[in-house]
C-alpha cells in the first residue's frame, strides 16, 4: 500500500472555539488535535506528509515541525475553503515532484482519527480501483455535517454541505468525515474546476467528487466506529468527546485488571501504563508517560505527570511530576513533588512536604511540613517536621547531603552547600551551616529569654 502523499488540513481558525489559539492546537487527552492526526497519518508511511496552514500560520507550522522536522508546510492564501487548501498543497507538491499515486487528505479536528481506519480506507480505495474514495460514517444526529448523496444503485453522487442541503438531503444520516483518498491525477483535474458558488462563498473540496466521477470511479468507505471520525467544533463538543473517550480508556484498563472506582472522575491519557491490581481512586489525573506499577494505589485526588510509581507504592492527594517513587513508598497526603525526585523503596514523603531534585534512600522518611530541594538523603534516615534545606543563595542552587541512619530533629535548617555524615543526630531547631562528620550529635545552642509580666499591646 504505497501512499504518495498525505495532506493534513490545519488552516482554519475554529471560531466556535472562542479561543486566541487555532483550534488544531487545543489539547485532547494530552496531545493537540494536530499532533494526534499527524500521529495517525504518519503511521501509514506516506512518501510526503504536508500540513496546510493559514490562521496563525507560523504557530501551527512550528507545532507541526516539532512533531516532524521533515514535514512539508503549505501556506494557504486568503482564498477560503478546503478546496483551496488542497489546491495550494497540490501546487507545491507537484512543483517539487512529490506526487504520483494515492493522496490521503484529512482534516485536523478529529482527535480520535486512528491509523487502523485510515489503513483500511486506503486499502479499500486501492482494491476498488477508485479514482476517489471518501470516508463516511452514519450518525443518529448528522447536524453540521455534509451529507453523502447516493444514486439508487448506491454509488456516490456528491456531498452536500449542511447550509446548501434541501429537506430530503438533510434527512440523510450518512455523512462526510472530511477524510479522502484521491489518485493524484484525478485530484489535480478535479480541484482545477472548483467554484465558490455556495452559501459560504468558499472552494469546497467536496465539490471535487462530482468532477472526479468523470475521471474515475468514486466510492465511499464507512468508518466502523463513528467515534474515530467525530469532529470537534466547540468546547462543548470537546468536553463531550473527551468524556466518552476517557470512559473507554478507563474501561480498557479495568478489563486489563486495574481497579478504577469511579471512571467518571478518573482521567487517564493515552501514553500512561498501569500494572495489574493497581487501584486508581476518584479525582485522579494520570498524564503524559506516567507508569503505575502492580498493586500501587493512586488517589484520591492525585495528579501524576510523567511520573513512575513502582509496585505497592501509595500516592494520596498529591501532585507528582517527573519523579520516580520506589516500591512500597508512601506519598501524601498533600505532598508536592516537583521534577527530578528519586525515591528508594519503603520511603515516605508525608503531609505538606515539597521536594525538588531530591534523592531519598530506602526506608527514609520525611513525614511532614518540610522542604527538601537539591538534596541527597541516605537510607533509613528520619527527617523531623518543619525541616528546610536552604538550597538557593540568590544566584546558584546548592546541594545538601545527609547520610544514612540519621535522625534530624524538628525545625532544622540546612544551609547548603552542606554535608552531613552517617548516623548523625541533630537537635530540634538546629541550623546546620558546616559539614558534620559521621556518628556525631549536632545542635545549635540558642539562648532562651523570658520576659515576665509581659502584656500584648492591646492589653497595655
Swiss-Prot record:
Q: Where is this region: N-acetyltransferase?
A: 257-460
Q: What is its EC number?
A: 2.7.7.23, 2.3.1.157
Q: Which residues bind Mg(2+)?
A: 109, 233
Where along this sequence does the record place binding of UDP-N-acetyl-alpha-D-glucosamine? 9-12, 23, 76, 81-82, 146, 161, 176, 233, 338, 356, 371, 382
Q: Record's InterPro entries?
A: Bifunctional_GlmU (IPR005882), GlmU-like (IPR050065), GlmU_C_LbH (IPR038009), Hexapep (IPR001451), MobA-like_NTP_Trfase (IPR025877), Nucleotide-diphossugar_trans (IPR029044), Trimer_LpxA-like_sf (IPR011004)
Q: Name one GO cellular component term.
A: membrane
Q: Which residues bind acetyl-CoA?
A: 391-392, 428
Which keywords belong to this entry? Acyltransferase, Cell shape, Cell wall biogenesis/degradation, Cytoplasm, Magnesium, Metal-binding, Multifunctional enzyme, Nucleotidyltransferase, Peptidoglycan synthesis, Repeat, Transferase
Please share the entry's free-text remark on the cofactor.
Answer: Binds 1 Mg(2+) ion per subunit.
Q: Which cofactor does it need?
A: Mg(2+)
Q: Which reaction does it catalyse?
A: alpha-D-glucosamine 1-phosphate + acetyl-CoA = N-acetyl-alpha-D-glucosamine 1-phosphate + CoA + H(+); N-acetyl-alpha-D-glucosamine 1-phosphate + UTP + H(+) = UDP-N-acetyl-alpha-D-glucosamine + diphosphate
> What pathway is this protein a component of?
Nucleotide-sugar biosynthesis; UDP-N-acetyl-alpha-D-glucosamine biosynthesis; N-acetyl-alpha-D-glucosamine 1-phosphate from alpha-D-glucosamine 6-phosphate (route II): step 2/2; Nucleotide-sugar biosynthesis; UDP-N-acetyl-alpha-D-glucosamine biosynthesis; UDP-N-acetyl-alpha-D-glucosamine from N-acetyl-alpha-D-glucosamine 1-phosphate: step 1/1; Bacterial outer membrane biogenesis; LPS lipid A biosynthesis
Where found, per UniProt?
Cytoplasm
Q: Where in the sequence is the active site?
A: 368 (proton acceptor)
Q: Which GO terms describe its molecular function?
A: glucosamine-1-phosphate N-acetyltransferase activity; magnesium ion binding; UDP-N-acetylglucosamine diphosphorylase activity
Q: Write down the Pfam families for this protein, in alphabetical order.
A: Hexapep, NTP_transf_3
Principal place of residence: cytoplasm
Q: Where is this region: Pyrophosphorylase?
A: 1-235
Q: Could you give the subunit structure recorded for this chain?
A: Homotrimer.
Q: Which NCBIfam families match?
A: glmU (TIGR01173), PRK14352.1 (NF010932)
What is this protein identified as?
Answer: Bifunctional protein GlmU
Amino acid at each position: 500500500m504505497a501512499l504518495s502523499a498525505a495532506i493534513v488540513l490545519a488552516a482554519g481558525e475554529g471560531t466556535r472555539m472562542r479561543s486566541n489559539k487555532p483550534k488544531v492546537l487545543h489539547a485532547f487527552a494530552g496531545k493537540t488535535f494536530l499532533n494526534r492526526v499527524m500521529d495517525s497519518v504518519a503511521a501509514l508511511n506516506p512518501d510526503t506528509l504536508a500540513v496546510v496552514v493559514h490562521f496563525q500560520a507560523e504557530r501551527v507550522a512550528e507545532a507541526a515541525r516539532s512533531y516532524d522536522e521533515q514535514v512539508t508546510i503549505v501556506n494557504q492564501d486568503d482564498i477560503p475553503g478546503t478546496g483551496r487548501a488542497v489546491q495550494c498543497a497540490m501546487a507545491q507538491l507537484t512543483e517539487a515532484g512529490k506526487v504520483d499515486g494515492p493522496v490521503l487528505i484529512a482534516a485536523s479536528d478529529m482527535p480520535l482519527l486512528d491509523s487502523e481506519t485510515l489503513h483500511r480506507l486506503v486499502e479499500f480505495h486501492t482494491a476498488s480501483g477508485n479514482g476517489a474514495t471518501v470516508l463516511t460514517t452514519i450518525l443518529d444526529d448528522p447536524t453540521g455535517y455534509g451529507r453523502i448523496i447516493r444514486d439508487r444503485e448506491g454509488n456516490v453522487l456528491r456531498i452536500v454541505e449542511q447550509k446548501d442541503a434541501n429537506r430530503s438531503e438533510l434527512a440523510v444520516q450518512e455523512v462526510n468525515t472530511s477524510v479522502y483518498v484521491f489518485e493524484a491525477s484525478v485530484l489535480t483535474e478535479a480541484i482545477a474546476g472548483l467554484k465558490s458558488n455556495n452559501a459560504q462563498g468558499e472552494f469546497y473540496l467536496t465539490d471535487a467528487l462530482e468532477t472526479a466521477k468523470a475521471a474515475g470511479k468514486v466510492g465511499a468507505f464507512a468508518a466502523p466506529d463513528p467515534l474515530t471520525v467525530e469532529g470537534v467544533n466547540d468546547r462543548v463538543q470537546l468536553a463531550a468527546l473527551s468524556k466518552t473517550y476517557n470512559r473507554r480508556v478507563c474501561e480498557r484498563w479495568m478489563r486489563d485488571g486495574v481497579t478504577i472506582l469511579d471512571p467518571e472522575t478518573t482521567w487517564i491519557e493515552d501514553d500512561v501504563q498501569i500494572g495489574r491490581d493497581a487501584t486508581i481512586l476518584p479525582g485522579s489525573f494520570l498524564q503524559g508517560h506516567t507508569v503505575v506499577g502492580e498493586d500501587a494505589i493512586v488517589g484520591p485526588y492525585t495528579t501524576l505527570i510523567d511520573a513512575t510509581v513502582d509496585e505497592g507504592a501509595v500516592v494520596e492527594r498529591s501532585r507528582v511530576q517527573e519523579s520516580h517513587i520506589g516500591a512500597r513508598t508512601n506519598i501524601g497526603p498533600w505532598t508536592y513533588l516537583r521534577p527530578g525526585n528519586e525515591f528508594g523503596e519503603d520511603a515516605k514523603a508525608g503531609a505538606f512536604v515539597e521536594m525538588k531534585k531530591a534523592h531519598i534512600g530506602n526506608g527514609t522518611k520525611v513525614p511532614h511540613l518540610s522542604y527538601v530541594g537539591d538534596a541527597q538523603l541516605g537510607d533509613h534516615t528520619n527527617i523531623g517536621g518543619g525541616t528546610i534545606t536552604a538550597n538557593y543563595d540568590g544566584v546558584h542552587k546548592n546541594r545538601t547531603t545527609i547520610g544514612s541512619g540519621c535522625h534530624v530533629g524538628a525545625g532544622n535548617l540546612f544551609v547548603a552547600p552542606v554535608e552531613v555524615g552517617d548516623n548523625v543526630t541533630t537537635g530540634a531547631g538546629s541550623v546546620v551551616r558546616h559539614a558534620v562528620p559521621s556518628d556525631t550529635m549536632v545542635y545549635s545552642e540558642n539562648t532562651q529569654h523570658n520576659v515576665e509580666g509581659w502584656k500584648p499591646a492591646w492589653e497595655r
